[in-house]
Amino acid sequence: MSIITEVYAREVLDSRGNPTVEVEVYTEAGAFGRALVPSGASTGEYEAVELRDGDKARYLGKGVLKAVENVNDIIADKIIGFDVTDQIGIDKAMIELDGTPNKGKLGANAILGVSLAAARAAADELGVHLYEYLGGVNGKVLPVPMMNILNGGEHADNNVDVQEFMVMPVGAPNFKEALRMGAEILHALKAVLKGKGLNTGVGDEGGFAPNLKSNEEALETIMQAIKDAGYKPGEEVKLAMDAASSEFYNRETGKYELKGEGVTRTSEEMVTWYEEMITKYPIISIEDGLDENDWDGFKLLTERIGDRVQLVGDDLFVTNTTKLKEGIEKGIANSILIKVNQIGTLTETLDAIEMAKRAGYTAVISHRSGETEDSTIADIAVATNAGQIKTGAPTRTDRVAKYNQLLRIEDNLADLAEYHGNETFYNLKK
């Protein structure tokens, strides 16, 4: 046993140039852990609270000095003296100290920074990798990357409504080859876009962000890039989408306004559109296909295509076991997106993954659009054998940091490493 002797937070920058929280944890034996907290652009209304200062004269109101102060002046006093390996105890103490259902008092960004830094310090204390500390001898499955190579919605300044169009190299023999395939497709996509005279600037997550005639044109363009890179769509590479539908849902009219296309759809019309798209294109995963509060629409979507396509709840479930439990009971979706900062502690994150697995739901470990060099989610993906990771295009250091960490983990696991490819979608009809 080694106790925590120091907890220190500071304000640093994320990949969008906005402030975020960095926390360091030290133990009496000299162990050390550091964690940086990510931040989202499109956020679910039920997410844990990210505490911002609100001072418009400083970082346009997005400073996090209050959260930093909460770590240094309040949380540190509570956590110092804890056994660094008592992750559940540490997280429980912070939740109780905050005392709100959404971590609104101290801030999920303050609490999460301490939670993740403590886990890293514990791994350092024991002389093991983070994935080994969290997953033990069983953590050995490298995730299929869900690579966002074409951006729209809140992640880009263009006229594409759907937020993310992704490729999944399901036919790769291992993670290393999957990453290579994704990178080659990204380069092929750039050439396709240039050939069409389209913009090759990138969005928040490293994918290209051109103006296109329709959301379907995005799918067609990616299909061409896959072929140009020398791969077979549907066999070696499948497509995935994050609609982030809450961003274009009009709650007053109850309709979906796809302004880029100049189209308005009802829930049922959205479901029909998705059904058409999965028939025409090798789409294996759709995230947030409907608004987070449109549970009737989600139920219909699940009934119509849930046996053929992974239906991921992000804003729908916000990594929250209460929301997930309700979804499981009602037969809504069949997968959950896992974002550590949506819930605010490592313990609650692992609980959500475990609940999903027990119910036959898949779990996709995810970054946020505002990221840092922190690669914790790569270790979480392997530790939990989640089988999937969503962490942007294979470009920009904030995204590549996670991919490079997975390469290191695969090397370290050597012959024990597994890559499940198509078998990742175990809850779908083959």
From Swiss-Prot:
This is Enolase. Coiled coil: none annotated. It comes from Listeria monocytogenes serotype 4a (strain HCC23). InterPro entries: Enolase, Enolase-like_C_sf, Enolase-like_N, Enolase_C, Enolase_CS, Enolase_N. Its main location: cytoplasm. Keywords: Cytoplasm, Glycolysis, Lyase, Magnesium, Metal-binding, Secreted. Catalyzes the reversible conversion of 2-phosphoglycerate (2-PG) into phosphoenolpyruvate (PEP). It is essential for the degradation of carbohydrates via glycolysis. It is found in: Cytoplasm; Secreted; Cell surface. It catalyses: (2R)-2-phosphoglycerate = phosphoenolpyruvate + H2O. Pathway: Carbohydrate degradation; glycolysis; pyruvate from D-glyceraldehyde 3-phosphate: step 4/5. Signal peptide: none annotated. SMART domains: Enolase_C, Enolase_N. One of its GO terms (cellular component) is cell surface. Its EC number is 4.2.1.11.
